[in-house]
Amino acid sequence: MPELPEVETTRRGIDAVITGKTLRRLLVRESRMRWPIPADLPGLLSGRAVLECARRGKYLLLRFEHGTQIVHLGMSGSLRSVPAGEAPRKHDHVDWIFDHATLRLHDPRRFGAVLWHPDTAGPIAAHPLLARLGIEPFDPRFDGAWLHSQFRNRAIAVKQALLAGDAVVGVGNIYASESLFRAGIDPRTPARRISRARCARLADMVRATLADALASGGSTLRDYVGASGQPGSYFEIHAAVYERAGLPCRVCGTPIRRLVQGQRATYYCPSCQKR
């Protein structure tokens, strides 16, 4: 699933392409996504200008004068800029057509979402998908004290607490495993047992890991590409544990282990990461 670095890389790539530009047509080839795309959405947006291209967690927010379009890339989606008139490929489900270019949503598994939140429904932050999201990892308030305050009453494993999204947003499966490795914390450790000092280390490593991923254009394991169609290179350059089960740890040489937590694969070094 595209995580914060992939979504932010996409946002940066499409921002200059669409912000301030008028959407000529929203073309929906397949409306059966995670939630059905409203049938009246093309009519609501055609001829309207995009005022802002923002992000909250893993959601892209396209701001119009009368509301906000919420776009989620799902498990396998990507949003890229293509030349006007370029023929669609299989699984190209939605086009945002501008005078000079087209944004195209490609989503083989159709777990993504294209939703509409009118201004008359209240602030976008109150939308049910956004209202309970945690703090952004690059927010100055995100530090060890914050993380400790969010973890201290949670009995679940620290990896699952990171994935929950209500303490900090945008840290998905890849970067949770990588951040915990860099922080030296066993992913099975109950969140409430993580000391304030270790929370400080973990907060630093979450930020550092995500910053490395942003600088690399995210990670491409299967389907993700950035707005220009380029794959991300974080996995090839930086990944220390993710999908490296049985291979030697880059620090100590101990074989990396794989386990399943909450139906998600977790990778860790049993020597470098302590409970």
Swiss-Prot record:
The active site consists of P2 (schiff-base intermediate with dna), E3 (proton donor), K58 (proton donor), R264 (proton donor)
Positions bound to DNA = H91, R109, R154
A GO BP annotation: base-excision repair
Signal sequence span per UniProt?
none
Print the keywords alphabetically: DNA damage, DNA repair, DNA-binding, Glycosidase, Hydrolase, Lyase, Metal-binding, Multifunctional enzyme, Zinc, Zinc-finger
Q: Looking at the record's lineage, which domain of life comes first?
A: Bacteria
What EC designation does it have?
A: 3.2.2.23, 4.2.99.18
Q: Where are the zinc fingers (FPG-type)?
A: 240-274
Please share the entry's free-text remark on the cofactor. Answer: Binds 1 zinc ion per subunit.
Q: Which cofactor does it need?
A: Zn(2+)
> Which chemical reaction does it catalyze?
Hydrolysis of DNA containing ring-opened 7-methylguanine residues, releasing 2,6-diamino-4-hydroxy-5-(N-methyl)formamidopyrimidine; 2'-deoxyribonucleotide-(2'-deoxyribose 5'-phosphate)-2'-deoxyribonucleotide-DNA = a 3'-end 2'-deoxyribonucleotide-(2,3-dehydro-2,3-deoxyribose 5'-phosphate)-DNA + a 5'-end 5'-phospho-2'-deoxyribonucleoside-DNA + H(+)
Q: Give GO terms: molecular function aspect only.
A: 8-oxo-7,8-dihydroguanine DNA N-glycosylase activity; class I DNA-(apurinic or apyrimidinic site) endonuclease activity; damaged DNA binding; zinc ion binding
Entry-linked SUPFAM superfamilies: Glucocorticoid receptor-like (DNA-binding domain), N-terminal domain of MutM-like DNA repair proteins, S13-like H2TH domain
**UniProt cross-references to InterPro entries, sorted A to Z:** DNA_glyclase/AP_lyase_DNA-bd, DNA_glyclase_Znf_dom_DNA_BS, Formamido-pyr_DNA_Glyclase, FPG_cat, MutM-like_N-ter, Ribosomal_uS13-like_H2TH, Znf_DNA_glyclase/AP_lyase, Znf_FPG/IleRS
* Subunit organization: Monomer.
Q: Which PANTHER family match?
A: FORMAMIDOPYRIMIDINE-DNA GLYCOSYLASE (PTHR22993:SF9)
Stated role: Involved in base excision repair of DNA damaged by oxidation or by mutagenic agents. Acts as a DNA glycosylase that recognizes and removes damaged bases. Has a preference for oxidized purines, such as 7,8-dihydro-8-oxoguanine (8-oxoG). Has AP (apurinic/apyrimidinic) lyase activity and introduces nicks in the DNA strand. Cleaves the DNA backbone by beta-delta elimination to generate a single-strand break at the site of the removed base with both 3'- and 5'-phosphates.
- Name the protein family: Belongs to the FPG family.
**NCBIfam families, per the entry:** fpg, PRK01103.1
* HAMAP family reported for this sequence: Fapy_DNA_glycosyl
What name has this protein been given in UniProt? Formamidopyrimidine-DNA glycosylase
- What species was this sequence derived from? Bordetella petrii (strain ATCC BAA-461 / DSM 12804 / CCUG 43448)
Chain's gene name: mutM
